[in-house]
Regions:
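C-terminal cap/substrate-recognition subdomain and adjoining C-terminal extension
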Residues: 2-9, 88-91, 95-224
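A general structural signal for well-ordered alpha-helical segments in protein cores
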Residues: 24-25, 71, 170
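Electropositive phosphate-/nucleotide-binding environments in soluble metabolic enzymes
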Residues: 21, 64, 80, 166-170
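Active-site neighborhood of HAD-like aspartate-dependent phosphohydrolases
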Residues: 2-59
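Short N-terminal signal/transit or membrane-insertion segments
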Residues: 2-8, 48-50, 62-79, 213
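Amphipathic alpha-helical interaction elements
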Residues: 19, 75-78, 132, 136
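Short, mixed-charge, low-aromatic patches
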Residues: 42-49, 60-69, 84-89, 125-133, ...
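Short linear elements at protein peripheries
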Residues: 29-30, 56-112, 116-118
Length: 224
């Protein structure tokens, strides 16, 4: 009898897990820096900077920690930009910013699971417009992420549907988990609801062990 390895459902967070940084706002800023000829974009960027300086977002986040208002306001800067340009910049963002900043030990795990034939998902609050290029490059067929809203080929400056964060991640992936062996890789404590749902939670930590992961006795991948 030939032993066949068991196929698993494997979930990878994106920001801080596969990529070394938080990617959503940075994508918008990558675009804004290349849209400097637009007075409207420059004016919106000025407003965001002033709100940061006055700590408006920080204060609001203390009251409404799950709203992520700053992320929504940052995305507002893109209102009116064509889909074609957003997509062109997303590909450039992947090539220039994401690919050089992958977390190598986690990407190695990703490749291993794909080679094993496991069903791999990228589940992220990052934006689909650039995650699709990462997924295509590494051969990941299934992604669930926050989406930028477009209408008639123009960015609306807001998200389409729910932001794929915290409990929303669980809602997205739960239908795929029943009766399957499951693994999840993430760096963030905000993903605790997801980690508690899977059979094998793995926390990705930068430089040193994270206390919350230790407290839950989770396996860790520590990279530097």
């Amino acid at each position: 009898m030939i032993f066949m390895p068991t196929k698993k459902i494997v979930i990878f967070d994106f920001c801080g897990t596969l990529i070394t940084f938080q990617t959503a706002d940075r994508y918008v800023m990558f675009c804004v820096e290349r849209l400097h000829d637009s007075k409207v974009v420059r004016w919106r960027h000025f407003i965001i900077r002033m709100m940061d300086k006055l700590r408006v977002f920080k204060i609001y986040n203390l009251i409404h920690p799950d709203n992520n208002w700053r992320k929504r306001m940052v995305l507002w800067q893109m209102k009116g930009v064509s889909y074609d340009l957003c997509d062109k910049l997303a590909k450039k963002y992947f090539e220039e910013e994401l690919l050089p900043n992958v977390v190598q030990p986690v990407v190695k795990k990703l490749k291993g699971h794909l080679a094993n034939g496991d069903r791999v998902f990228i589940l992220s609050g990052g934006y689909d417009i650039y995650i699709k290029y990462f997924a295509k490059y590494f051969g990941v067929k299934e992604t669930m992420s926050s989406k930028i809203a477009f209408q008639d080929g123009v960015c609306l400056g807001k998200m389409s549907g729910k932001d794929c964060m915290r409990e929303n991640k669980v809602e997205c992936i739960r239908p795929y988990l029943d009766g399957e062996d499951t693994i999840c890789y993430t760096d963030s404590q905000s993903d605790l609801p997801l980690l508690k749902l899977v059979d094998e939670p793995v926390v990705v930590s930068h430089d040193s062990s994270q206390h919350w992961a230790e407290n839950h006795k989770y396996k860790q991948i520590i990279w530097n």
